[in-house]
């Protein structure tokens, strides 16, 4: 429904003679959260890895390196279905926005104001963040965001150690990691000039990501 709500607003703006740009941001930098029922156990190794960087499943649910990315695998039929009803948004892959450096300034600003952002999230959401919380999630040696601890920051590099005992540095100008959702969403508003965005009611609930996003943005 969010897609069609945005389409209706976009068309109404154009009909009224206003400038309107309708973009659809694909959460391709988001991690695989678990092995779903249609996936083989082989996907266990990809938990925590960005959807853009893991292989699509074949007909048996096994990772197929020749079939493109997991993100594209599920995005393609969705866009085809939208096209059948005349909806053609401008598609933006979020991992590409990270990889081309558009997030860099937002990430740097976020890290510099980490304490203030922690206070915003905790006071508005009513939940306490972990003592090791850091407003940027770098990818570890296995490509996963899970089990990675930030050890320092020297712009543009976030230094880390992971669950395998390995250390490294993530370049905030590349897709070496991502902002947590509540911060990522707010950053997109500024990067893409978003002025209107339909969203699920959970985001708009008291203490939700919209409430924390406004002061962060």
Describe the role of every protein-language-model region.
Residues 1-118, 207, 211-217:
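N-terminal Rossmann-like or analogous alpha/beta NTP/dinucleotide-binding catalytic cores
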Residues 113-119, 123-217:
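Alpha-helical recognition segments enriched in aromatics with Gly/Pro capping
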